[in-house]
């Protein structure tokens, strides 16, 4: 369970906090030619290794990063403006599925160095973070089709 939480935290940090919107736009525009796609994949690998903190997990982290690259590559090639929501949700579902599978398959080779208190704290931090940044990004993305209709530009900028 704790490995799943670590991998989920690594994913959320890498996909939401450490990936600027400019990178997402560059990936959509330049597809496989975007250096941002490769940097994003490398960040996933590094953050996963830092959070798991076990060198024997390097093969699994490589697998996660490689599948993340392929999934993001498919997404940028096949999504269109009208299908962005569907591809975003499918992309996230694929990433979470990979995390679940890796957490299950790798349990026999990964040893956690954290005591129980730290496991609880890590779970709590991951849960709280999930409720802030990633969930708000998902909600904003899902309701984006209606925000342009309800926007009122008669206010102060950034107010």
List the predicted regions and their residue ranges.
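Hydrophobic, membrane-facing alpha-helical anchors
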Residues: 2-21, 71-73, 122-136
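Alpha-helical membrane-inserting segments
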Residues: 13, 17, 47-51, 67-78, ...
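Cytosolic, membrane-interface loops and tails of multi-pass inner-membrane proteins
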Residues: 16-30, 71, 75-79, 135-159
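Multi-pass membrane catalytic core of lipid/isoprenoid biosynthesis enzymes
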Residues: 31-55, 62, 88-103
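Membrane-interface helix-loop-helix junctions at boundaries between adjacent transmembrane segments
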Residues: 70-93
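Alpha-helical transmembrane segments of multi-pass integral membrane proteins
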Residues: 90-107, 119-140
């Amino acid at each position: 369970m704790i490995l799943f939480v670590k991998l989920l935290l690594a994913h959320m940090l890498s996909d939401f906090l450490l990936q600027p919107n400019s990178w997402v736009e560059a990936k959509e525009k330049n597809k496989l030619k975007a250096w941002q796609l490769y940097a994003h994949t490398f960040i996933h690998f590094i953050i996963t290794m830092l959070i798991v903190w076990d060198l024997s997990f390097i093969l699994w982290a490589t697998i996660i990063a490689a599948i993340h690259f392929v999934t993001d590559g498919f997404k940028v090639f096949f999504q269109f403006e009208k299908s962005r929501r569907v591809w975003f949700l499918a992309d996230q579902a694929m990433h979470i599925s990979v995390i679940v599978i890796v957490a299950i398959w790798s349990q026999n080779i990964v040893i956690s160095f954290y005591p129980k208190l730290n496991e609880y704290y890590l779970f709590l931090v991951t849960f709280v973070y999930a409720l802030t940044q990633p969930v708000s990004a998902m909600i904003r993305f899902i309701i984006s089709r209606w925000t342009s209709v309800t926007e009122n530009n008669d206010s102060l900028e950034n107010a």
